[in-house]
Design a protein with these regions (language model features):
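Conserved NAD(P)H cofactor-binding loop of Rossmann-fold oxidoreductase domains
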Residues: 74-79, 243
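Active-site helix of classical SDR
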Residues: 106, 143
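Canonical Rossmann dinucleotide-binding motif of NAD(H)/NADP(H)-dependent dehydrogenases/reductases
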Residues: 2-33
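Residue(s) in the substrate-gating loop at a strand-loop-helix junction
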Residues: 127
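C-terminal substrate-recognition "lid" of short-chain dehydrogenase/reductases
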Residues: 212-240
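Short, small/polar-rich loop/turn modules that mediate ligand/substrate recognition or access, typified
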Residues: 162-167, 232-235
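Substrate-binding pocket helix/loop in short-chain dehydrogenase/reductase
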Residues: 82-83, 90-95, 204
Length: 247
């Protein structure tokens, strides 16, 4: 078993996303970081929608490092569209990646690492869209609402009936500026509503009291703090949205 704490960060697509910032933060704090995504430039190829792929990844980590102190799912997909035109495969893809993926990840984490005597953290990025209705985001919102309740239920189960201490929680972030998902959302709004990029961004920030989106570094700081200090938040969904939830 390696001496350093080991963290698996899922979803590190590109340099400007949440996962990349989380990787940098945990590396700076001295953790051994294992990156996973559906690309070749990561430590482990991992398709969160395929059980065999997920199981292989966790087996590799156990065989290689002997421990896994935290799993931080930062992956996600948001495909906007009108309900009357929305393709079924877009719905399936959204649910599979955003919700089924969490089930497969946590299941594998428990199966491979439970009862090793170590504290464990499962802390995905969810979304304020789980609670705040937004036009054209019904699939994404439904997947994130399901994710939130999945985390609440499994936190209760793992802490009540398992010996090891588990922190199972979620960070429900608001708009994170400059990420690939943010850029795609703006592009979709521009195309669907025939508006300018400036207008699309003002629509997205209109209800945020601070008047801006989060930065990826801010999300990474919150994730590190919660993962290391947030034991009593297990089962809670932590809203990081600059007061947007207050209206």
């Amino acid at each position: 078993m390696v001496g350093k704490k080991v963290v698996l960060v899922v979803g590190t697509n590109g340099y400007d996303n949440i996962g990349a910032a989380v990787v940098q933060k945990f590396m700076t704090e001295g953790w051994h970081v294992v990156t996973a995504d559906i690309r070749d430039d990561v430590d482990i190829y991992l398709d969160v929608t395929k059980k065999a792929s997920v199981q292989d990844a966790f087996k590799y980590i156990k065989d290689t490092y002997g421990r896994l102190d935290a799993v931080l799912p930062c992956h996600g997909v948001n495909i906007l569209g009108k309900i009357e035109e929305y393709p079924e495969d877009h719905w399936d893809k959204t649910i599979d990646i955003n919700l089924k993926g969490l089930f497969l990840l946590l299941q594998a984490y428990v199966q491979h690492f439970d009862n090793d005597g170590l504290r464990k953290v499962f802390l995905p990025i969810t979304s304020d869209t789980a609670e705040i209705p937004k036009t054209s985001t019904f699939a994404y919102g439904a997947s994130k609402a399901g994710a939130n309740h999945f985390l609440r239920c499994t936190a209760r189960e793992l802490n009540k009936y398992h010996k090891d201490p588990w922190l199972v929680s979620g960070l429900a972030v608001g708009m994170v500026a400059g990420t690939p998902m943010d850029k795609k959302t703006i592009a979709d709004l521009v195309a669907q509503r025939d508006i300018s990029e400036e207008k699309a961004r003002s629509m997205l920030t209109a209800n945020i009291p601070l008047g801006r989106g989060l930065t990826t570094d801010e999300v990474a700081e919150w994730m590190y703090f919660t993962a290391t200090k947030g034991d009593y938040s297990s089962g809670c969904i932590l809203r990081i949205d600059a007061g947007q939830c207050q209206g």
